[in-house]
Regions:
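Short hydrophobic alpha-helical segments of the AMP-binding
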Residues: 47-55, 61, 166
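Conserved AMP-binding loop of ANL adenylate-forming enzymes
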Residues: 39, 165, 177-191
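Conserved AMP-binding/adenylate-forming core of the ANL superfamily
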Residues: 2-44, 48-52, 69-74, 125
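Conserved pre-ATP/AMP-binding loop-to-beta segment of ANL
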Residues: 130-148, 154-155, 184-191
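Structural core segment of the AMP-binding/adenylate-forming
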Residues: 28-29, 56-126
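Conserved S/T- and glycine-rich ATP-binding loop of Class I adenylate-forming
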Residues: 37, 54, 85, 143, ...
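Conserved short alpha-helical elements in the N-terminal third of ANL/AMP-binding
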Residues: 53-57, 172-178
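Conserved AMP-binding A3 loop
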Residues: 11-13, 144-172, 180
Length: 191
């Protein structure tokens, strides 16, 4: 399996197909290259799918701390220029409070956890059930990856990396730990 979380398991094929469907939905809603996609989700397979879907449209996934209060959420989603936000259903009341303050957001996607769907939002499962997979597109190592800091000394700040730089850094870290991995991104492309 590619991902296991509780009782939910995704094969590599299912993971790729779900992400391709979510990516097509994002694209259909005007989210594309360099667009930011907020992930206000618990650790889950859906978090991984939404994260990968953002990459598939050459977008930038934005990590959102589920403990944030309304003012912190508004700050982070506005500061990051998020154009789509995936959120756990249990946070629908928080989303309802902040939604009008975030006019840049084109699509709100609610993951069903038993909470009624918030008006104006799209149900994650409906996106999966009703969207055809997006065809693969060529991405490059200069695409941006951004991680927001924890905000321990003030409000969180986005730290930007290129995909290539991030992967090369991870390869060097693994190599330093004694793991047999390719030397760099160029070696991966040749395998």
């Amino acid at each position: 399996p590619a991902a296991i979380c509780g009782d939910s398991t995704l094969s590599w094929k299912e993971y790729d197909q779900e992400a391709a469907k979510v990516a097509q939905f994002l694209s259909d809603n005007g989210v594309g290259e360099d667009s930011k996609v907020g992930l206000y989700l618990h650790n889950s397979n859906q978090y991984l799918v939404a994260h990968y879907a953002a990459f598939k449209v050459m977008g930038v996934p934005i990590n959102v701390n589920y403990r944030y209060q309304a003012n912190e959420l508004i700050y982070l989603l506005d500061n990051s220029d998020s154009e789509a936000v995936f959120y756990q259903g249990c946070y629908a009341n928080q989303i309802k409070k902040i939604r009008d303050e975030l006019p840049k957001v084109k699509a709100w996607i609610q993951y069903d956890d038993g909470t009624p769907l918030l008006e104006g939002s799209h149900a994650y499962q409906d996106v999966i059930n009703n969207t055809a997979p997006m065809p693969r597109i060529e991405r490059n190592e200069d695409n941006i990856y951004m991680l927001y800091t924890g905000g321990t000394t003030g409000m969180p700040k986005g730290v930007m990396y290129t995909h290539g730089g991030f992967v090369n850094s991870m390869l060097k870290t693994l190599k330093g730990m004694g793991v047999d991995v390719p030397e760099d991104l160029a070696d991966i492309k040749n395998t």
